[in-house]
Every structure is written in structure tokens, then in C-alpha cells.
Amino acid sequence: HVVLYRSFGWEESMPYFAHLPLVLKPDGNGKLSKRDGDRLGFPVFPLEWTDPVSHETSRGYNDYGFLPEAFINMLALLGWNPGHDKELMDLEELISLFSIERIGKSGAKFDWEKAKWFNHQYLQAMSTEQLALCMQADLEKNGVKADPAYVKKVCGLVRERAFLIPDLWANSWFLFRAPEKYDEQAVKKVWSPETPALIRSFAGEAASVTVWTQDHIHTLVQDFVTRNGIRTGQLMTPLRILVVGSTQGPGMMEIAELIGKEEFLSRVKSGLDRLARI
């Protein structure tokens, strides 16, 4: 750039130039490229980009579910340091602290897990109302119409598991619709000939309760397992599979309260009927 300015005789109006350090591959061997992103499973462009020659489309950070402010924060700290250990800074603070003198001379290794950590921190700082707005696109894509107040409750329940925006849906879809299939390996591991009768007995008792809150459900479960001389997991793990489809997810008491008693019992009955046919 300097040579171009000089060749055109524009030296008097030439701005000061400074080169930021290269962003290196995660192992530090060479500069980061699109090929590295494709190979290692992360984006290298801020937005979706289509190669004009190959017509190959690459998803960007925006498409992966990064918040703009998290992306900027992460990128600013590649090759530059603010002079202290604080990592989370908004754009205004980054601008106020920036100085050429603190730009490093060596390349900066890109860390995908660290990039997701930044996004996770920003997601945790958002209100449930803001998270619900972030989740709206995934709800629409999956044909889900839900009460905004319910969506906010869902976001509050799964927010700690979300590192990228799509994680909100990935960790909560079962709070909007019943599972259509069940984790076969999980079923084989916890199911026994006595399990269906045990579950039906608990469901019968659950159907008779009038108050359906986490505390009341917890008391119901503890009373049941004590009277039947079983471990809590012998009841709760099969119930989780029937209600969620797998052994993953937030606490079962929280799930049960959120989806409501009728939906809970409906899923239990439907799941038992389906598994009986397998």
C-alpha cells in the first residue's frame, strides 16, 4: 500500500498503515484458511460466502449462531491485548482501550472452543426475553408456535447449555413436542421386564395429584421409590426416556412442571405403547 501511495505521489495524504498479526491455525502451524475451517468444522468468514469460481458456499459465524458482539470481542483479542486480564468487553470499551502499541508481533492461534466460550458468556448475560427472540428463527423453521411467556421459561431452563444460538433449540425441542423415537441403547440399558408396570403405577399416582410443581413432583417421586424399595434412577431414567426420548436434558422435575401434567402423562402412555411394540 505504501508503494502505491508513493508511486502516485500521494505521500502527503498517505494514512498510517499497520498490519495486524496473522490468525494462525489452531496448532499454530501456518495461517488459518478456509480449508482449515472445512476440515476442522468451524467458520472462517463472518457471513455466508459463495466462491465465485467454484460456487461453493461456506457458512459464516452469523450462520453458526454467533452474536455480533461476541464475535467482535473474540476477534479483537486475537493479536492484541488490553493490558489486563479481563476478556469480556463491549465494543465501546474495546475502542477506548485499543492502542497500536499493544498489538503483538507474532501470529495468534485461533481457538474454536474459546470462540464458543465467548459466545456462551454473551448468551448467559442476555435476558430470557432476548434469548427467546434469538430462538424465534429455529421455532419457525421447525413449525413451532408457542406462547412467548412459555418460550422465555424454556430459554431460562436451557440457557446454560447454549454456546451457539441453535443450541437453544437443540437442547429444548422436547419441551415443544413429544419425541417420535427413543434412544435404543438407553432403553436396552435401563429397561427391565418390571419397568412398564412400575411406570404405569407411578403414572396412576401422578394422575391423581392436584398440584404439579417441582417440589410436589419431587415429593411424589421420593414417596413412590421408598414405598416400592427401588432406586430413584430405576424410575426417573425410564421416565426421562419416555418424556424426552433420551437420557439427556435438564432436570426431570423441571421438565415435568414446564410441560404440564397432562402432557407428561400423555408422553408416558404413548411411549410405553410404542416401546411395547418394539
Predicted regions, residues:
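Short active-site loop/helix that positions an aromatic residue
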Residues: 1-8
